[in-house]
């Protein structure tokens, strides 16, 4: 027995020692983590890669190779799995050498510096340093070998003479990584660094794998993705005037895209603007909303707002003018620009907007209906096997029980609307209080104060705002192109299929008051009456239908509101194709045609672009080069002067749009473009006025679900409701006991009265 007692005592002692050691290790780890994120640390672009100043390895660059994945290390012991798209892994063979250092520090990187020419090895003074409010940033200079202003455009000979230099800073973190506790929460400002080597693109935010991979330009995705890139003509001090700033927000329906798909070297260097491109959270990670305090949503648009704040506070160090920031981008990027233009937290920072094929007033730009957002979140959670009994359980399952790859790669077809994810109107949502989380305050959560249309009508934007917008003639061709069913049928649409697609549209948008009337109205508007059975015209009309509904009509609506309030507004319609692509006739001018022209692709080395966009120099035509020069000059002029053509560009000029006479530049080529008025007014009015007011408003319906979610969220709430329940039970028990006691007392009194009234009976019982 004594030996057994000694063994038990020894075991207890060992357990105590183990617990003590564990506590010491945890304390030390916490202390190291706290030190590692101090403002005096050296920061290396990825979550967990911090080296404190006082350790021996401070000067050693610790790098996780983003280009080829990475393995666990002592700084980040968790293996996160491959981040490349599976279909592109064959591009990375085991014999491929790993770069010992990131970006250009490990050797010449053609995707960052262009083609390596004989004189590239003698390139001196490559590195450039800039001091920001967050610490010092190291970038690099890139040599450019073609000149958009040159009269002679060499299209079939090698270009070997350096014509310009541009200063490039890639992968600058504008917020703390939105990982772990930061998932489904607003972004937090970065805490700074001592020296940041901004020499490689940051990873893209998680998105479906069909959009990722080396051939598509998105080599790596990671939840730690809140980075921005800066291109500037010069960082030298003493400039008489700062450059205008062009803030690029990528499109992609709020579900895919990346900042590195817009290399802005030519635009910045030759047109004297500072260009900034950003990543922001996408899909469910960026826009999941339960309509309450568990996940209000809008994290992606809040990321954009924080990036804009970072630029506003720091861009002067890169010779950018913070009071001349122009937001631009295609599709979702254009819609985001319009929302930031009127949002309370950002409107004072936005001086101009260029909306390419997108509008803040589009149906897909903002989810107005709270229950639509909740329904999308429930359907998404169910698809990943999460409980939807309450919003708290739903969010906890997605936050703690699913990886970012699972969340990013899960695609969803919405019950209502075009795209599943978008900013949601949140001004009446309940949000977490200041005491709920250490790093977040109530002011961090709300983005909207009212509907965007109401903000525009109330003139809640900068007084010096200028607006420019454009659409293409075949905006929705990409929807047809990406439809797998239509692809199997060689994109042929006959009258029966047209009717089917129109009915799908009617049902998807739940025109429940008169669905048959809506169907007939749409069919009448978009039937090609000279030859109703012609499948070519039917396909063209269907593309026009979707283009007008999703892009043209919303663009027309916001333009009219701004023109009525005397905001300088310039419009264009793009009606010419990129000749080098040789696209089929029905999709010559699709959505975001301007991308390759705005990036100066006809003048850039092909190495800057992913395989998807690589076009040899001899494929570009003179018209492509002219259009590229025109768009870069017009956009940069607008950012600088508020007018895209203060003087003619290749013989072309814009006119201001006016009330009752919406003038727009109809861009065919630089030889036969012209100013016209009132683009597709009948079709725009059909979608904006006729359907909503005459046939019936949008009345969305959803699968039956519990209307209200409830679940304890915080310890104080759990304690409160537990005590409340206990008190209620005690109260009920007390009432029951009182009633029983009173009943018993009543019976006792009645018995005494009976005995008092019958003394003979009482005496008999006694005897």
Tell me what each language-model feature is.
Residues 1-13:
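N-terminal secretory signal peptides that target proteins for export/translocation
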């Amino acid at each position: 027995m004594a030996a057994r007692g000694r063994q038990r005592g020894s075991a207890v002692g060992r357990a105590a020692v183990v617990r003590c050691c564990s506590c010491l290790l945890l304390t030390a780890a916490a202390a190291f983590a706290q030190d590692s994120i101090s403002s005096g640390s050296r920061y290396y672009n990825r979550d967990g890669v911090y080296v404190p100043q006082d350790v021996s390895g401070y000067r050693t660059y610790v790098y996780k190779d983003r280009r080829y994945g990475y393995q666990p290390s002592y700084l980040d012991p968790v293996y996160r799995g491959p981040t490349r798209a599976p279909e592109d892994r064959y591009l990375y063979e085991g014999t491929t050498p790993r770069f010992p250092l990131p970006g250009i520090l490990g050797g010449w990187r053609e995707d960052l510096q262009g083609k390596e020419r004989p004189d590239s090895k003698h390139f001196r003074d490559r590195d450039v340093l800039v001091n920001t409010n967050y610490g010092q940033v190291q970038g690099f200079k890139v040599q450019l070998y073609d000149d958009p202003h040159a009269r002679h455009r060499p299209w079939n000979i090698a270009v070997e003479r350096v014509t310009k230099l541009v200063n490039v800073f890639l992968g600058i973190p504008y917020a703390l990584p939105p990982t772990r506790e930061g998932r489904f929460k607003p972004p937090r400002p970065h805490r700074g660094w001592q020296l940041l080597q901004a020499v490689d693109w940051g990873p893209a935010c998680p998105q479906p794998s069909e959009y990722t991979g080396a051939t598509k330009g998105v080599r790596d995705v990671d939840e730690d993705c809140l980075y921005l890139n800066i291109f500037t003509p010069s960082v030298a001090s003493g400039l008489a005037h700062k450059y205008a700033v062009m803030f690029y927000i990528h499109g992609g329906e709020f579900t895919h895209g990346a900042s590195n798909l817009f290399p802005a070297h030519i635009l910045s260097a030759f047109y004297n603007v500072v260009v900034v491109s950003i990543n922001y959270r996408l899909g469910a990670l960026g826009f999941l909303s339960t309509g309450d305090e568990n996940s209000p949503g809008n994290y992606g648009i809040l990321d954009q707002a924080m990036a804009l704040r970072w630029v506003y506070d720091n861009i002067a160090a890169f010779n950018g003018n913070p009071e001349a920031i122009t937001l631009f981008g295609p599709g979702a990027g254009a819609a985001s620009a319009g929302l930031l233009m009127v949002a309370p937290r950002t409107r004072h920072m936005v001086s101009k907007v260029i909306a390419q094929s997108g509008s803040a007033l589009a149906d897909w730009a903002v989810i107005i209906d709270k229950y639509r957002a909740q329904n999308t979140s429930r359907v998404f959670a169910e698809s990943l096997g999460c409980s939807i009994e309450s919003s708290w359980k739903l969010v906890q399952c997605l936050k703690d029980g699913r990886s970012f790859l699972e969340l990013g790669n899960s695609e969803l077809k919405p019950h209502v609307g075009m795209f599943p994810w978008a900013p949601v109107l949140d001004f009446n949502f309940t949000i977490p209080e200041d005491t709920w989380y250490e790093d977040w305050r109530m002011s961090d959560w709300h983005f909207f104060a009212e509907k965007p249309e109401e903000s525009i009508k109330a003139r809640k934007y900068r007084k010096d705002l200028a607006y420019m917008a454009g659409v293409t003639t075949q905006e929705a061709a990409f929807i047809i192109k990406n439809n797998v069913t239509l692809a199997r049928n060689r994109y042929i649409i006959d009258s029966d299929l047209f009717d089917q697609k129109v009915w799908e549209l009617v049902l998807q948008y739940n025109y429940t008051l008169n669905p048959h009337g809506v169907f007939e109205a749409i069919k009448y508007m978009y039937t090609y009456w000279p030859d109703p059975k012609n499948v070519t015209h039917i396909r063209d009309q269907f593309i026009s239908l979707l283009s007008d509904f999703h892009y043209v009509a919303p663009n027309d609506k916001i333009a009219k509101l701004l023109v009525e309030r005397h905001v300088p507004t310039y419009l264009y319609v793009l009606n010419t194709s990129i000749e080098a692509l040789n696209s089929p006739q029905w999709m010559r001018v699709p959505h975001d045609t301007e991308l390759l022209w705005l990036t100066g692709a006809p003048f850039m080395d092909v190495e800057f672009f992913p395989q998807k966009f690589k076009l040899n120099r001899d494929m570009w035509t003179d018209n492509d080069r002219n259009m590229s020069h025109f768009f870069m000059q017009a956009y940069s002029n607008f950012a600088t002067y508020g007018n895209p053509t203060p003087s003619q560009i290749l013989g072309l000029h814009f006119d201001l749009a006016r009330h009752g006479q919406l003038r727009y530049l109809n861009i065919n080529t630089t030889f036969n473009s012209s100013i016209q008025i009132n683009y597709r007014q009948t079709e725009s009015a059909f979608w904006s006025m006729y359907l909503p007011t005459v046939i019936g408003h949008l009345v969305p319906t959803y699968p039956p679900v519990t209307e209200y979610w409830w679940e304890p969220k915080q310890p104080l709430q759990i304690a409160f409701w537990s005590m409340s329940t206990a008190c209620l039970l005690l109260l009920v028990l007390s009432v029951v006991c009182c009633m029983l006691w009173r009943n018993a007392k009543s019976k006792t009194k009645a018995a005494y009265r009976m005995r008092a009234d019958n003394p003979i009976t009482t005496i008999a019982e006694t005897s």
